[in-house]
Amino acid sequence: MKLKDFFTPDTVKLHLEGESKDEILKELIAVLRLDEKSQAILYKTVKRRENLGSTGIGKGIAIPHCRSLVVNRLRLAYGRKPEGIDFKAIDGQPVYHFFLIVAPPLEVSNQYLPVLGKIAQFAKDPDVPRKLQEIDAEEAFLELLEAKAV
């Protein structure tokens, strides 16, 4: 299982426009291309998870994640906010890179936690935040995942 396999150019958005945590979450959810009702349900679920504690893990990266009935398989999206926003990250720094993970409540493949772990491992690489900022096309994001062999 490689992270690259969970993304397509359509699930990568390099110029998030939101100016707040809520706007960014809604924009990331929209990348998954769910119907309007499902997006609203998913937003409430992600927001509830975020209220338990920020998913901003530091170094400019956040991994909002949850389980929800609105998906029938693991779904991921990546978004970048070049200017960064206050996401209440654990290091107190702005967040520029967002990895959204949504899994169904009962996931037969059990990929949710391993994928979450792989993204956290990817984020720990000291070069990753800089390389993510330098990406100029969605395909380059996929190439970076491949190059880092996660």
Each language-model region and where it sits:
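Cytosolic covalent-transfer regions centered on His/Cys nucleophiles
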Residues: 1-150
